[in-house]
Amino acid sequence: MNTIWLLLASNVLMTVAWYWHLKSPASVPLLGFILISWLIALPEYGLAVPANRMGHVSLGGSFSAAQLKIIQEALALVVFLIFLLVVLKEALRWQEYVGMALIMTGLGVALSGRTRYAAASVKPAITEVQP
């Protein structure tokens, strides 16, 4: 579960880094927005990298790399949706809600049977050296 919380926190930082400037005045130079966004995004790596290592089956976690990516994308979508509605105050069209529902359905499909998949098809990245 720590994997999910770390991925969630990393997605909050990344969403803020990518979209906060849309509510900022246009008088600020683009380079300023880029530098501030980079400073917000940098700590995101400090959360995402450990989350992926902790969650990967080859390192004792429960997920394949593909499953981790799909989880990350689903979390990014949820975080973005909240940011869009609360901070940017933009409305979504029904087509966008349907598109998001399809992505979440894909998450369900990808995670179904994950323990069997992870145990059977992913080889450990770290093995003991045989003398």
Predicted segment positions?
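Polytopic alpha-helical membrane proteins, predominantly small-molecule transporters/carriers
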Residues: 1-131
